A protein has these predicted regions:
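Conserved beta-ketoacyl condensing-enzyme motif
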Residues: 16, 50-109, 225-240
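Short glycine-enriched loops at secondary-structure junctions
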Residues: 22, 81-87, 137-138, 177, ...
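Short, well-ordered, mixed-charge alpha-helical segments that flank or form enzyme active sites
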Residues: 88-89, 139-144, 189-193, 311-313
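Short glycine/threonine-rich loop-to-helix capping motif typified by GTGT followed
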Residues: 92-95, 234-249, 314-321
Length: 334
């Protein structure tokens, strides 16, 4: 059912049947370390490049999710996946052995939200019994692609965020579980003209604000109708900006807001500056922390809003602004 300007409410809500998370060593040392399904001994995952390591994480996450659901790849109708690298090579190489029909997606760090939205639409529309969603990011591969090789040892400003080395995989289907996707709000591109690639939180906060408000308008809800409103990776800088933007529009989500980039690392002892980011940040946190809280009934309804800064090395070097996008996924206990 179409809701408002940008949202869909599902009459037959798809379920998140199972999920899995794979992360690197630093993430395993953070507050959620014991909750992840797999923590690498180092960030190479037995490979000889950062990019291959990221593909290995995706492969492991998919296999773990399928194993936990007692399924084979043949039970999946379509795969929706993405990462931060050029042409989505981490995903292509990571899932090729599964031989599942695939949609390769790019929404920067919002890709997990985009993928979950599309997968749930397909299931709700009857185009398949089960879909597989997977996204990933890697600190080493992202730094090499968008900033500087690690061996360069450049200084990072305090507004910079630490790209999470991690992957999350989710099986979205018709079989009942304790978490269902009851609706989605598809985000718009929001551009405030910012150009600082070392301050991604500021670039993404306006898009998060836009989607959160639109979700409440489309579904005719208030902040208190959600136990948590969870953004993907605004970090400490972006969260502060989000609160200011929401306040200007007479909304207050302070008491209910959580950010995956602020949750996955311990700011006081891990020196990640403004927090975590990356396609794997929201995905791994969703699998390891958010879904269990919903499944247990601790949270009854959550608005999950992965956020992305839409830039490339070319657009940045040509002086283009960095617009943001955010997709809202309504998750409910059942």
């Amino acid at each position: 059912m179409i809701k408002g300007k940008q949202s869909i409410a599902f009459k037959a809500s798809p379920y998140i049947e199972e999920s899995a998370s794979v992360v690197g060593k630093k993430e395993g040392e953070g507050p959620l370390g014991s909750r992840f399904d797999m923590v690498g001994l180092d960030d190479m995952f037995g490979e000889d490049t950062w990019e291959k390591a990221e593909s290995s994480m995706q492969k492991e996450a998919c296999q773990l999710a399928l194993g936990k659901a007692h399924l084979t790849a043949g039970a999946i109708r379509y795969l929706f996946g993405g990462d931060l690298l050029r042409q989505g090579v981490a995903t292509s190489l990571g899932v090729e052995q599964l031989q599942i029909p695939m949609f390769g997606l790019y929404g920067a760090c919002s890709t997990s939200g985009e993928a979950l939205a599309l997968a749930s639409m397909c299931v709700a529309a009857g185009y398949g019994e089960r879909m597989l969603v997977v996204t990933s990011s890697h600190f080493g591969s992202a730094e090499k692609e968008f900033r500087f090789p690690l061996s360069y040892a450049n200084q990072r400003p305090l507004s910079a965020q630490w790209t999470v080395t991690g992957s999350g995989a989710f099986i979205v289907g018709k079989n009942r579980s304790h978490v269902r996707i009851t609706g989605v709000t598809v985000g718009k591109i929001v551009d405030y003209g910012l150009k600082d690639s070392q301050n991604m939180g500021a670039c993404m906060a306006p898009a998060a604000c836009d989607t959160i408000i639109q979700n409440q308008e489309d579904f005719e809800r208030k902040e208190e109708d959600y136990d948590r409103i969870i953004t993907g990776d605004l970090g400490y800088v972006g969260q502060s900006i989000l609160f200011d933007l929401m306040r200007e529009k007479e909304y207050d989500i302070k008491e209910r807001h959580m950010d995956c980039g602020m949750t996955i690392f311990d700011q006081s002892r891990q020196d990640t500056h403004a927090g975590g980011s990356g396609c794997g940040c929201a995905a791994a946190t969703l699998s390891a922390y958010i879904l269990p809280a919903i499944a247990s009934g601790e949270w009854k309804r959550v608005l999950f809003v992965p956020t992305g800064a839409l830039m490339s090395t070319v657009s940045y070097n040509e002086g283009a602004s960095i617009p943001g996008i955010a997709h809202g996924i309504v998750l409910e206990h059942c």
